[in-house]
Amino acid sequence: MFISGYGLVDLLKLTDKKELVGIELGCGDGHTTLHLLSSLPNLTLYGIDPYIGYDDFNGHNPAEMLAGNLVNTMQKIDPYKDRFTLYRDISDNVVDKFENESLDFIFIDGLHSYEQVLKDCENYYPKIKKGGLFSGHDYRVIDSVNRAVNEFAAKINVSEIGETQNDVWYWVK
């Protein structure tokens, strides 16, 4: 099974922080959520996913399937529920719940349209602390993600975008 969070966990383990606070935009089937929480005992994680039907790069994702994903995700992370909060909403509606420069990392793996990835970058980048990790998934495999991330990076003068073997893109703020 492929879990996109493997590359992210390796990066976060390099920090010397006693406590980590982060956001996962797009929790999906919960594999990455579980991996983050089980691998990083010092992590408080906020998940943002509306679990509603939508069309994306991989076709139609019916609401019934996503409702099943929600149930599975919550069952998987039950042992870690004291360190996890799920906002069942779209990322645009949740961004104001977080103070600027309050988070150690953000992992963007939600709606993969060019417009939404760019908007998530613009909305959530200010939430990262200086020295925090700004990251996401599907940089090499989905053109819309690649274009949006590259455009945003250029806009804020990020000259190098790091990548892991698990197709996680990142840079340090």
Residue ranges and their predicted role:
Residues 6-173:
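S-adenosylmethionine/decaboxylated-SAM
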